[in-house]
């Protein structure tokens, strides 16, 4: 007989229990999780075959991401337009610009154009004080034809060139008068700072002191000579210059005398201190002179389209010639 307290041993097969033998790590790798099993079912087609791989990537699910909160915008600051700057502010800015930049500023907007169109405004007054020598400011006869600060400043940029001058000449402290030193057997000339190639331009020339045997006023290219030995009409002696000798009233170009000017019998001689106005019309390719506001007729025609500079040449010692650019002459 068996004892009642003996435990009945039931086989594992009847309890559907697995063996208590521990599983190996290799066995765990072969076990599919429910999630993997679900994925494998989805990835298979109806016949149990894996689906065809697609080159298109599945777009990300944006619904699962939280939307970042919007940043609070700062209050809009009022924008300051350069075209609405006060005139006092523009004056402080424009005084540091060159004439070329000022011209560009005039084409920028109506406000800047109006500020710079006032020829006697504080802008031009300040620039005039900065650029113009004190000797020119104090000369009461230098700017008789020029009233505004803008025109005076423009004349300064067209004055005699200290770097384009014969070695026997020098420019006085006012910047507009050339002085010839007493050197024997020498003809000496000078050119203006800026040349002209289009438009109509007028230059007032005044000869102070004796003329000597040669005293020529006119214009030349950048290549014309400004010094030679002897006393000759240097301005007009080659094809790069055109001149009018005030001593004998003869026009010269390319070494040829073109006749007496003005074309009349016994034309009056030049008197020291008279104002001679040289007018170069680059559009019509002609040039002429005026004496005391009197038109003397066309002096030169068929002038080639070159950049032309006002010029003079002298031979008499200690004589002086003043030249002031006045812009476009008054017609009629």
UniProtKB/Swiss-Prot annotation:
Ranges for region Disordered: 1-81
Which compartments does it reside in? Synapse
Domain B30.2/SPRY stretches: 138-330
Q: What cellular component GO annotations does this protein have?
A: neuromuscular junction; neuron projection; presynapse; SCF ubiquitin ligase complex; synapse
What the entry lists under Pfam families is as follows:
F-box-like, SPRY
Chief subcellular location equals: other
Q: Which GO terms describe its molecular function?
A: protease binding
**Residue ranges of every copy of the F-box domain listed in the record:** 79-127
PROSITE patterns annotated for this entry? B302_SPRY, FBOX
Q: Where is the composition biased (Polar residues)?
A: 15-24
The annotated pathway is: Protein modification; protein ubiquitination
Please give the SUPFAM superfamilies that the UniProt record associates with this protein: Concanavalin A-like lectins/glucanases, F-box domain
Biased-composition ranges, Acidic residues, are 1-10
Q: Which GO terms describe its biological process?
A: dauer larval development; determination of adult lifespan; negative regulation of apoptotic process; negative regulation of axon extension; negative regulation of axon regeneration; negative regulation of DNA damage response, signal transduction by p53 class mediator; negative regulation of gene expression; positive regulation of neuromuscular synaptic transmission
Keywords, A to Z?
Answer: Synapse, Ubl conjugation pathway
Which SMART domains does the entry mention?
Answer: FBOX, SPRY
Functional note: Component of a SCF (SKP1-CUL1-F-box protein) E3 ubiquitin ligase complex which is required for the restriction and/or maturation of synapses in GABAergic neuromuscular junction (NMJ) presynaptic neurons. Promotes NRJ synapse development and synaptic transmission by negatively regulating the daf-2/InsR pathway in muscles. By targeting convertase egl-3 for degradation, negatively modulates insulin-like protein ins-4 and ins-6 processing. May stabilize synapse formation by promoting the down-regulation of scd-2. Regulates axon termination in PLM and ALM neurons.
* PANTHER family, A to Z: F-BOX_SPRY DOMAIN-CONTAINING PROTEIN 1, SPRY DOMAIN CONTAINING SOCS BOX PROTEIN
As for family, the record states: Belongs to the FBXO45/Fsn family.
What quaternary structure, including any partners, is listed in this protein's UniProt entry? Component of an SCF (SKP1-CUL1-F-box protein) E3 ubiquitin ligase complex composed of cul-1, fsn-1, rpm-1 and skr-1. Interacts (via SPRY domain) with scd-2 (via cytoplasmic domain). Interacts (via SPRY domain) with convertase egl-3 (via C-terminus).
Q: What protein am I looking at?
A: F-box/SPRY domain-containing protein 1
Q: Which organism is it from?
A: Caenorhabditis briggsae
What taxonomic ancestry is recorded?
A: Eukaryota, Metazoa, Ecdysozoa, Nematoda, Chromadorea
């Amino acid at each position: 007989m068996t004892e009642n307290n003996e435990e009945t041993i039931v086989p594992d097969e009847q309890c559907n229990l697995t063996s208590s033998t521990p599983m190996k790590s290799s066995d765990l790798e072969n076990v599919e999780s429910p999630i993997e099993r679900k994925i494998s079912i989805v990835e298979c087609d109806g016949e149990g075959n894996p689906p065809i791989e697609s080159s298109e990537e599945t777009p990300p699910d944006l619904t699962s991401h939280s939307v970042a909160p919007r940043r609070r915008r700062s209050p809009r600051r009022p924008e300051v337009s350069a075209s609405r700057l006060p005139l006092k502010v523009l004056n402080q800015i424009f005084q540091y610009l060159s004439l070329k930049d000022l011209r560009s500023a005039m084409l920028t907007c109506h406000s800047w154009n109006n500020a710079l169109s006032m020829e006697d405004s504080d802008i031009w007054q300040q620039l005039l004080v900065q650029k113009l020598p004190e000797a020119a400011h104090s000369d009461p006869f230098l700017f008789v034809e020029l009233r505004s600060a803008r025109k005076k400043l423009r004349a300064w940029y067209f004055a005699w060139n200290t770097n384009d001058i014969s070695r026997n000449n020098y420019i006085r402290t006012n910047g507009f008068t050339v002085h010839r030193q007493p050197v024997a057997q020498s003809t000496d000339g000078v050119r203006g700072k800026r040349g002209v190639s289009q438009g109509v331009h007028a230059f007032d020339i005044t000869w102070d002191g004796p003329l000597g045997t040669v005293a020529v006023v006119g214009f030349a290219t950048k290549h014309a000579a400004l010094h030679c030995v002897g006393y000759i009409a240097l301005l007009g002696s080659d094809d790069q210059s055109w001149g009018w000798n005030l001593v004998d009233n003869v026009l010269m170009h390319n070494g040829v005398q073109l006749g007496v000017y003005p074309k009349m019998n016994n034309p009056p001689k030049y008197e020291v201190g008279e104002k001679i106005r040289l007018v170069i019309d680059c559009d019509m390719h002609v040039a002429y002179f005026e004496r005391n506001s009197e038109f003397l007729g066309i002096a030169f025609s068929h002038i080639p389209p070159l950049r032309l500079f006002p010029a003079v040449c002298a031979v008499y010692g200690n004589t002086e010639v003043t030249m002031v650019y006045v812009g476009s002459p008054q017609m009629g």
